[in-house]
Amino acid sequence: MFQKAHINTVSVGIFSWAVLEPEEGKYNLGWLEEIIDNLYKEGISTILATPSGARPKWMADKYPEVLRMDPDRTRRFFGGRHNHCYTSPVYRQKVHDMDKLLSQRLGSHPGVILWHISNEFGGECYCPLCQQKFREWLKEKYGTIEKLNSSWCTTFWSHIYNSFDQIEAPSPKGENELHALKLDWNRFVTDRTIDFIKGEVAAIREGGSELPVTANLMYDYNGLDYKKFRDVLDVVSWDNYPSWHKKEEFFTAIDAGMQHDLMRSIKNQPFLLMESCPSATNWKPINKLKKPGMMLVSLFSSGSRLRQRFILSAASEPGGF
């Protein structure tokens, strides 16, 4: 089927942690290796993903600190995808161990050509661990609390801080009007995310693989400063689901072209399209079947070197990739 569809590269393992490690410390990589072997025999290359985008239930139950805390300081339940704390030492260690093992077992496979780090990084955590890292980040940036107060204009509304320990991240239950606080928090979230990516890449290198790495960025996402990703990614990739065949097509064309240009400009080099859909998706009210070749023309004329579809297999399949 893949050959008939002219598919020469696939991404695997993206949301597969619960299958790769069904119980703590008990790993099952055989099925993944078999898939990569079979693809390679058919002349199809593999982009191997790290599974940190969705953690298994046993981890959330045993180590609740891996779950995010919302702005109102309540801990989330298990579920969803981006529901993990980028600061949690437990989560970072678990991710490190998994990534290193994948690198050791599969990083030198001749069919593997690229590492896909996690999936669609985004969101933020307001737990005590992240709060403390935020205070350390502020202290490193400003040096003294006096300089922070001056830069943030905290005299307004009598919001002067006496020490960095008094500072809390923005919250609907507390400080949520101080623009400088919100801006620095967003900058901190980007730096925290990048630091997490660096940890994943380091684990892969420890496992022996020197293959390039990418991370699939998201359309028009303003929660992270993508320009800062240029130093941690070898190649930029992103996910694009344009809604073609509306009344005014040129808006969609212009928007898609602009997004392609933004992704290409992050590293000033060709990019990859990691996700797209030729027909309908289950999260858009309207997403018509595209005319043959139209996305291909838009994509490659803007500098892409890869077009991948998501998702080709049912989520009930092993690994859910």
What does each model-found stretch correspond to?
Residues H6-N8, Y40-T46, S108-I113, G208-P212, ...:
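Short, well-ordered coil/turn segments that N-cap beta-strands
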Residues F2, V10, L39, L102, ...:
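Conserved, mostly hydrophobic/aromatic
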Residues W58-D61, C125-C130, G319-F321:
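Short aromatic-enriched loop/helix-cap "lid" or pocket-rim segments at secondary-structure transitions
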Residues F2-R76, K100-S103, G107, I197-G208, ...:
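Aromatic-lined substrate-binding rim segments of carbohydrate-active enzymes
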Residues F77, T214-F321:
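Hydrophobic targeting/anchoring helices
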Residues G25-W31, P89-D97, I254, I286-K291:
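Glycine-rich anion/phosphate-binding loops
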Residues S11-S16, A49-W58, I113-G122, L217-N222, ...:
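Short, solvent-exposed turn/loop segments enriched in Gly/Ser/Thr/Pro and often Arg
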Residues D72, R76-V235, D239-A256:
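Polysaccharide-binding and catalytic clefts of secreted carbohydrate-active enzymes
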